[in-house]
Amino acid sequence: MAGMKTATGDYIDSSWELRVFIGEEDPEAESLTLRVTGESHIGGVLLKIVEEIKRKQDWSDHAIWWEQKRQWLLQTHWTLDKYGILADARLFFGPQHRPVILRLPNRRALRLRASFSQPLFQAMVAICRLLSIRHPEEMSLLRAPEKEKKKKKEKEPEEEVYDLTKVVLVGGVAPASFRGMPAHFSDSAQTEACYHMLSRPQPPPDPLLLQRLPRPSSLLDKTQLHSRWLDSSRCLMQQGIKAGDTLWLRFKYYSFFDLDPKTDPVRLTQLYEQARWDLLLEEIDCTEEEMMVFAALQYHINKLSQSGEVDEPAGTDSGLDDLDLALSNLEVKLEGSAPTDMLDSLTTIPELKDHLRIFRPRKLTLKGYRQHWVVFKETTLSYYKSQDEAPGEPIQQLNLKGCEVVPDVNVSGQKFCIKLLVPSPEGMSEIYLRCQDEQQYARWMAGCRLASKGRTMADSSYSSEVQAILAFLSLQRTGGGGGGSGNHPQGPDASAEGLNPYGLVAPRFQRKFKAKQLTPRILEAHQNVAQLSLSEAQLRFIQAWQSLPDFGISYVVVRFKGSRKDEILGIANNRLIRIDLSVGDVVKTWRFSNMRQWNVNWDIRQVAIEFDEHINVAFSCVSASCRIVHEYIGGYIFLSTRERARGEELDEDLFLQLTGGHEAF
């Protein structure tokens, strides 16, 4: 028994004194001293601490933090010897859940209690459960960017911070619904207001504020965001996060599974907000026509949100049935993520045959587009000088598996081009296909996109892909093509009220156009979406965002093995992209479906990947930790294993196995 003394007061056993500080990491925190032995287990030490404090309260959330080892002592049956704790250990007895401020995708601030002792992935599951967001595996936390020091001390405007620190959910029990919202949000007017903030789109930002916010001016600037992601396999405490710190909550993985407006109002709204701010802050590029469509959708969504039309459709349109089918398949999956239809192998593979204009940019050439007879079968594109020569040898045959497919469209100018970057021994071979009209473009574009993923036009998703492309093009078409609704007047005079175009477009368009030039263009585009309900408009916005060429690419500065210069590595949901840093051109693409294995040498901070056909790629990370690249690859592979039949069941162990590293902390 610890603490046996002789008559003179000397200890005669193997006990020793252990000092424990009470509270969070604070040099001035009060402390108490316990008499323990190496055989004392953590549970017994916790009991002694509570007895010494002599204060009645709920201590169930408290645990011991070992400062030197950056470790929580959560195994209460382990002894001090097993942990390796000696008398010089700095131990803190404090709560495992502590308040943090989250900056949400809609840019609003929310204070809640997060776990500082569990791996971040598990903490995210709890946070998303509190916020009523399904599929927490798609989200993560970033460190807030450091604030620039200003020469003049400007008084920061006061910001409303919503508070959920007093809301506690019972573990293992699905939150009940009450009055159309999760029951824990209906406890008070404050929590109810918080739910409305989460589930309803925010009004357009102040144009002056929008111009002052930092925006990336180059591809290099876009890499800075991705250096701030927290490690999913370590807890907040291990990563230096303190109580009261501000963190950003964002969708990290651009693979959105089973997006349902009925069950996902918060997830849908926050995803829309992240897409909206990506466009407004120029994190992703779009054309002038596309920006007008995005502005019109924002204007329409804001009108419905302000009028209180949250769930009821603003009109009906039989033509939306096919679009709804396309939207239901918006999840982006890796190849092989689900078994292919058995009937696919029994049917004949559809072909595309048509006249297209083709252009192959080469150095020192002035030749433009030339018309050819083009045949597209399975994943192979062949083109001939004329239709009569088709049975013979083609001018060129291209296998599109693993290629980059980039749209180059101007609807008002009747320009429907497809840019293909096809892998070749010399790098990426560039070729342009010019289509005659929207229908031809949609068929060929859908075929190219599927072929790039190794799938053919016999795939069940081909028709929905064609419809989704046509739907996006129809939004860019000028004139009232959407069919009106009596509840939403179509005329510019009736719709212009409250429209400030500068809050709906990126700053580069603010500089290019005056407000009186933007307003009629936005209202004209609005006629194509005026019949949509709020959730339909948000889904259409997300779909249009997903159609952009640069959608879903996270950028990191790396240096490839054997190279003397830095380059950009783009990480998408199904591929890695090598990009020239100086000009932004794609140099090479590697598909995850062709990847055999990857590993990280934590000592030299190098990622090595092996692909089929004995292709080996190795690089060191410059702008971010190689852990971030490792986690992206493992995370996307994990997301590809999700199946609709399993519902919301989440294999946390598999995620941590695929994304967790062995980095020496």
Swiss-Prot record:
GO BP: cell-matrix adhesion; integrin activation; integrin-mediated signaling pathway; leukocyte cell-cell adhesion; platelet aggregation; positive regulation of cell migration; regulation of cell-cell adhesion mediated by integrin; substrate adhesion-dependent cell spreading
Gene Ontology terms for molecular function: integrin binding
CDD domains: FERM_B-lobe, FERM_C_fermitin, FERM_F1_KIND3, PH_fermitin
Ranges for domain FERM: 229-556
Keywords: Cell adhesion, Cell junction, Cell projection, Phosphoprotein
Compartment annotation: Cell projection, Podosome
SUPFAM superfamilies the record matches: PH domain-like, Second domain of FERM
GO cellular component labels: cell projection; cell-substrate junction; podosome
UniProt-listed PROSITE patterns: FERM_2, PH_DOMAIN
Residue ranges occupied by any PH domain in the UniProt entry: 354-453
Sites of Phosphotyrosine modification: Y11, Y502
Transmembrane region(s): none
Residue list for modification Phosphothreonine: T589
Similarity field: Belongs to the kindlin family.
Subunit and partners: Interacts with ITGB1, ITGB2 and ITGB3 (via cytoplasmic tails).
Domain notes: The FERM domain is not correctly detected by PROSITE or Pfam techniques because it contains the insertion of a PH domain.
Function field: Plays a central role in cell adhesion in hematopoietic cells. Acts by activating the integrin beta-1-3 (ITGB1, ITGB2 and ITGB3). Required for integrin-mediated platelet adhesion and leukocyte adhesion to endothelial cells. Required for activation of integrin beta-2 (ITGB2) in polymorphonuclear granulocytes (PMNs).
Name recorded for this polypeptide: Fermitin family homolog 3
Gene that encodes it: FERMT3
